Amino acid sequence: MTLIDLANPTRFLALTTRVLPWLAAATVILLAIGLYQSALAPDDYQQGATVKIMFIHVPNAWLSMFVWGVMSIASLGTLVWRHPLADVAAKAAAPIGAAFTFLALLTGSLWGRPMWGTYWEWDARLTSVLILFLMYLGLMALWRAVEDPSRAARAAAVLTLVGAINLPIIKFSVDWWNTLHQPASVMRMGGSSLDKSFLIPLLVMAIAFTLLFVTLHLAAMRNEILRRRVRSLQMMQASRIAFSSEMGAGSRHDNASKEIGAA
Amino acid sequence: MTALSALIRRDIRIALRVGGGALIGVLFFLTVVVLMPFAVGPDLALLSRLGPAILWLGALLASLLTLDRLFMADHEDGSLDLITMSRTPLELACAAKALAHWLAAGLPLIVATPVLGLLLNLDMVATGAVALTLLAGTPALTFTGMIGAALAVTLHRGGLLMAVLVLPLSIPVLIFGVAASQAVIVGPMSFGAPFSILCALSLVSLVIGPFAAAASLRHGLD
Amino acid sequence: MTMSLGPYASFIVTSYAAAALVVAILIGWIVLDYRSQTRHLRELDRSGITRRSGRSAMDRP
């Protein structure tokens, strides 16, 4: 199965149908292992049991950026290499990435309440992720604003790439802005070198969520291909009806002109 | 070169006409600044603390408002197609249009800043600092906003979508613009660092903006 | 699984529950969308439309 084969939508659909059950199974297994390990993880010295939120929060935060990276590569595929399935990949990834970003924000907020005493904190990381979430929503709006999927694809591709350039800039700016305004408290994750008892569940959950993304993404791509097929078939059907009604209308036109003439 | 200068002159002339939108931007700027005390309260001390932020926010929103028409008017009367098809590279044409827009719509905002600074109880130094940062930062706003305008040009109700697309891109400019102004007013932080980053953002947008806008136009107008 | 989740247990549970809910919504949307598209394709196939390549709408790979 070379990359060229993947360019053919029908073959791609065949591939997904074969691969999806395995991916789904692997995702479920890894999620189960990860959840089990998270439950068994010890309490943090400072944070207590709330450190368990990290096992959901960090993978989602990581994925929110990873998905934008995937969309950026897909956008390059659309603009530079004109790969037929690139825009399908980009469009399918956006809602999934937005959902992960939302989860990162929500769990970050729920983690923050015990830690900082407030649900929202204009911390550099939370703020950058919030802006990323806004960008996801803007991108999804752009996809749906243009009727023709392939034209929408090109506009969305440009926006995705501009956003990719802008994300490091935003992170840096917000970091600067944050140090300028001296946050009320500084978030500690137990240090940058995580203890193994935290690191392993975290990595397992990260891999599990990544597999989840791949599974959902392939399934969503399949849906998008089918949706485009439906659209083109519906257009064919509509033109067929219009054509046949034109043929039938020919005689009706004569009658109409006769009536007008009579009147 | 003459094609580009003709484009710039044409755009400026159109923008400065009554329906052109350049001076409307200043009016909107004034409106936003006037509305702020109604929301925040007439406490002059508070207003002068918020002053740079209010001015920057007003300038950001005002330039967003006028960016909508950067390509829309040309698209409607067909001249955008002519520009796309002409021999001058589309990137340079986009840069020229953005420059014209900044001259016609951005500069008046900067000129209006000292007057509005008075309304917000800002002293000369503060107002000067804000005006200087606006001078350095509004090109960034215009050139990145142009990307959103180009993306939205083929959409009929594109205006609001364009604002949503452009705002995340303008956040760094806003952050550093206000940081630089505050550095002059409040003090311990240096002015130079955020100001040079602001200039850097503008310079980068001078390059990326036209390329991204041209790509959007090319793909969107097929 | 009895473990003490400490004084902030509700936050931990809400986080995991929210994650489960969002993932469930994603899966649900994808599954429903798939069913909707295949239903449309079946209806189009029944009305005799073929794709440009001549293959039927319900081309089951």
Swiss-Prot record, chain B:
Q: What does this protein do?
A: Required for the export of heme to the periplasm for the biogenesis of c-type cytochromes.
Question: How does the UniProt record describe the way this protein sits in the membrane?
Answer: Multi-pass membrane protein
Please list every transmembrane segment annotated in the UniProt record, as residue ranges: 20-40, 44-64, 102-122, 134-154, 160-180, 195-215
Single GO molecular-function term?
heme transmembrane transporter activity
Any single Gene Ontology cellular-component annotation: plasma membrane
One GO-annotated biological process of the protein? cytochrome c biosynthetic process
What is its subcellular localisation? Answer: Cell inner membrane
Protein name listed in UniProt: Heme exporter protein B
Q: Which UniProt keywords apply?
A: Cell inner membrane, Cell membrane, Cytochrome c-type biogenesis, Membrane, Transmembrane, Transmembrane helix, Transport
Record family assignment? Belongs to the CcmB/CycW/HelB family.
* Pfam families membership: CcmB
Gene name of the record: cycW
Its primary localisation, in coarse terms, equals: membrane
Species in which this protein is naturally found: Bradyrhizobium diazoefficiens (strain JCM 10833 / BCRC 13528 / IAM 13628 / NBRC 14792 / USDA 110)
